Regions:
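Short, amphipathic alpha-helical "lid/cap" segments that border enzyme active or binding sites
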Residues: 137, 141, 170-181
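A short acidic (Asp/Glu
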Residues: 15-18, 45-48, 77, 89-94, ...
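Conserved catalytic-core segment of nucleotide-activated headgroup transferases in glycan assembly
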Residues: 1-52, 132-134, 148-152, 167-168, ...
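Hydrophobic/aromatic beta-strand patches that form the interior of the parallel beta-sheet core
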Residues: 34, 63, 79-81, 100, ...
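Catalytic binding pocket for nucleotide-activated donors in carbohydrate/polymer assembly enzymes
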Residues: 84-165
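Short, conserved catalytic or adaptor-binding loops enriched in Gly and charged residues
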Residues: 26, 50-58, 120-128
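Short, solvent-exposed loop/turn segments at secondary-structure junctions
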Residues: 9-13, 39-42, 70, 86-87, ...
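Donor nucleotide-activated moiety binding/catalytic core segment of transferases
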Residues: 47-89
């Protein structure tokens, strides 16, 4: 049975609050579902989470992951469903597995972002490099089935995206350590250079 991790973001218009119950209901009979809500959703979307617990809490193919450690759920998942959460790219680029993005309002914490950037960033511009955007929930299961059945194609596609988006993908920890060491050695004054 394929394992689907549903890890939405939080804030206005997030997929959990708007469509969470419907998403789980549409998938629970065909897949194992792990819901991993954002920690802020425990406060902001507590009513939705209560409804989900009541409706699906005892279902053998449903689990609610509230652990501080996301790694076990991420590793188990064959596919991730999210909205505008950064976990989507972390998952896809780390595990070379596809993401289904539930279409909804873009998460914007700085409404003046376009004053400083020419493009909205990878969370908007590169979504189709690592997955498929779903606007209508009636398309959700067919899209998931297509992504799972074409996993090899998506692995290659996401690998290409990873090479375009990440610097030193297999050596990033060592390179980051060297960079921070150089910054520390050349630090002047008492403030760190903000990068």
């Amino acid at each position: 049975l394929p394992v689907i991790l549903f890890a939405p973001s939080w804030g206005d218009g997030n997929a959990l609050a708007l469509k969470g119950v419907d998403i789980i209901a549409a998938l629970i009979e065909e897949y194992e579902i792990i819901l991993r809500p954002h920690v802020m959703s425990l406060i902001e979307d507590s009513q939705t989470l209560d409804i989900i617990r009541q409706r699906f809490g005892s279902h053998p193919r449903f689990s609610l992951d509230l652990s501080a450690d996301s790694a076990p759920s991420i590793r188990r998942a064959d596919l991730l469903i999210s909205d505008w959460s950064g976990i989507a790219f972390e998952y896809a680029l780390s595990f070379l597995k596809p993401v289904v993005f539930i279409d909804g309002p873009m998460k914007v914490f700085n409404p003046n972002w376009n004053r400083y950037l020419q493009e909205p960033g990878i969370e908007k511009s590169r979504r189709k490099s690592v997955g498929v955007i779903v606007s209508e929930l009636t398309n959700l299961r067919p899209v998931i089935n297509e992504l799972l059945s074409s996993a090899d194609v998506w692995t290659t596609r996401i690998m290409d995206a990873r090479h375009e988006l990440l610097f030193y993908p297999s050596e990033c920890a060592a390179v980051s350590h060297r960079t921070l060491t150089l910054l520390a050695e050349h630090q002047t004054g008492t403030e760190w250079v903000r990068v």
